[in-house]
Amino acid sequence: METATRTTYNGWANRETWNVSLWINNDWVAYEQARGFMVDYKGRTPFQDFVDAYGYISTPDGVLYNDPKLSKRELNSMMRELL
């Protein structure tokens, strides 16, 4: 009998991606900034462009917004779903 390997964290690619999404969606200031940013956004990489525009460095609990483990694909999708 094979054992399934857990490959996600709460439905996200990993803990870091989940954590960043959690903070953007649950911190009122970050959420409002992200929604406002997306209103007129026409680019292809909304997550990175948002982080760069607002100078985000890390979540309050220490996950870096430029952590190489982040799934940019998932975070870009999350940003597009804010509207």
Segments from the language model and where they lie:
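Acidic interaction surfaces
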Residues: 1-83
